[in-house]
Amino acid sequence: MGSEMCIRDSSYVTQALAAVLQLGVTMDYSIFLWHSYEENQERFPDDKKRAMAHAISNTLTSVIGSSITTVAGFVALCFMSFTLGLDLGVTMAKGVIFGVICCVTVLPSMILVFDKAIDKTRHKAIIPDLGVISGWVVKHYKAFIVTFIIVLIPALWGYTHYEVYYDLAGTLPGNLDSVIANDKLDETFAMNSTHIILCDSSLEPKEVNEMMSKIDDVDGVKATLGLDSLVGPTVPREMIPSDIKEVVMDENYQMLMISSEYKVASDEVNDQCDKIEKIMKKYDKNAMLIGEAPCTKDLITITNHDFNVVSTVSIGAIFLIIACVFKSISLPIILVAVIEFAIFINMGIPAFTGTKLPFIAGIVIGTIQLGATVDYAILMTTRYQKERSRGKDKMEAISIAHKTSMPSI
């Protein structure tokens, strides 16, 4: 976070999330190293430095592969049109890189320096021996494949049908002054959303009144307000005092206000904005519809595009990285498919519980979950390949890999 001062300003969302995310994501690498060190201490009980050297060597492949995939997941956020993605993506990618560097340099040094203190404060393992579970999972692997296929269908349905909301004002605490004021305005004047049209100031009053009359007929429009509707079309603009005219008009634009009875981010107000835009474009091709509702409508379009881009980039990048690390085409397909399956379940549950998620959740959660949890798949796969290279058959190799990886995972 300190490096942000030297590069650029960061958003309050990034400041709130980055430290927690970095701790949760990069802590894995420390745990991987520690468990490998404990395992090598049994091989070299009288030489802690040698045990640590072997621990670093054994975990380096999985840590580097895991960290690169995590970085790729965060870098994928940078492809968002929504600039929060760039801000969060760059900050977290840097954080993972710094975390890995500290894990393979500072952490081994600190473990060796404080080794005696660590031994004195050691307590009984809280996590029980998972050998029985590992054996049971490996023995019933066919049942898990069948379960995967059965659960995949509802998980995929839920993943494509969960609801999102774009009106973040609803998530704000009810005791904020701004929220209280908006609630009172809504109760007193039934104000839901207000649109503003910026059109050419050279438009004739007759054209403006004709345009506003058509907009009045659009469903959900409560009232329209402009300079000509206030003073009437019979009053020449030259006779209107300049201090009044300057409030709603300048040399280039004039402002028209539209009061809507629909709520922001609703399907009704989005359809209303489309109809208003069609009407105003007939009179001024360069006219702009602005306000909270039109802005939110644009946000919906942008985030839908961002979701597809970020998902494609993150899956593609992580696939290529795993393929390069393991020098295999089949392994990245299996690993990415397993993690995507977990993402389908995670993001699909709200569809069955009726829970609405904020619009940013689908983009950020999917990308972070893919980049962060693929670490565990890489750790287990690395150990599996190691055991296979030692001459073990596939069942024995996966059993050892599963048993030794479970405590770290």
Feature-to-residue mapping (PLM):
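Structured non-transmembrane domains adjacent to transmembrane bundles in polytopic membrane proteins
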Residues: Y165-L331, A337-K356
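Membrane-embedded transmembrane helical bundles of large multi-pass transporters/channels
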Residues: M1-E4, R8-Y166, K281-I409
